[in-house]
């Protein structure tokens, strides 16, 4: 399985998977403009022309990053795609020399399995709470 950086041509597939989860109330919706503006944050996994999963690493200053918009297609759940994407985003965070990576999530158990721990809101960048 190859995790790669997203291209502008991936926008329709990204919007489809993210907004499908948003309609279920488990992810924030994204607009095409917002996605285009932040496309460099995204990593993806495809099988041929089919998007299997995506996730983004959004920077907050020089030392913090947030895993955002982590989504795996329903048919591909439990296949390791989510873990592979988070691993790639964490590798990117290390390459950028970030001190910490965090996630706001409706699925805390998944992130706990990957070694994330719950923290108090005051431990996160204030800007993250505003976004």
Predicted regions and their residues:
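A short beta-loop-alpha structural element at the N-terminal edge
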Residues: 2-14
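Ligand-binding pocket scaffold of soluble enzyme catalytic domains
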Residues: 11-22, 59
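Conserved beta-strand in the GNAT
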Residues: 44, 50-58, 63-71
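Short active-site oxyanion
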Residues: 1-2, 95-101
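Active-site rim helix/loop that mediates acceptor-substrate recognition in acyltransferases
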Residues: 18-52
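Conserved active-site alpha-helix within GNAT-family acetyltransferase domains
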Residues: 99, 105-131
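A short, internal acetyl-CoA/4′-phosphopantetheine-binding micro-motif in the GNAT/acyltransferase core
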Residues: 70-77, 106-107
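Conserved acetyl-CoA-binding loop-helix of GNAT-fold acetyltransferases
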Residues: 78-91, 103
């Amino acid at each position: 399985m190859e995790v790669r950086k997203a291209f502008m041509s991936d926008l329709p597939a990204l919007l489809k998977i993210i907004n499908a989860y948003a309609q279920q109330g488990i992810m924030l919706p994204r607009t095409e403009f917002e996605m285009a503006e932040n496309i460099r944050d995204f990593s993806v996994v495809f099988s041929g022309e089919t998007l299997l999963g995506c996730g983004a690493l959004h920077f907050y200053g020089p030392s913090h990053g947030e895993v955002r918009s982590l989504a795996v297609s329903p048919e591909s759940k439990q296949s390791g795609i989510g873990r592979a994407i988070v691993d790639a985003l964490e590798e990117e965070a290390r390459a950028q020399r970030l001190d910490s990576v965090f996630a706001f999530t409706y699925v805390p158990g998944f992130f706990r399995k990957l070694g994330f721990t719950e923290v108090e809101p005051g431990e996160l960048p204030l800007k993250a709470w505003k976004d």
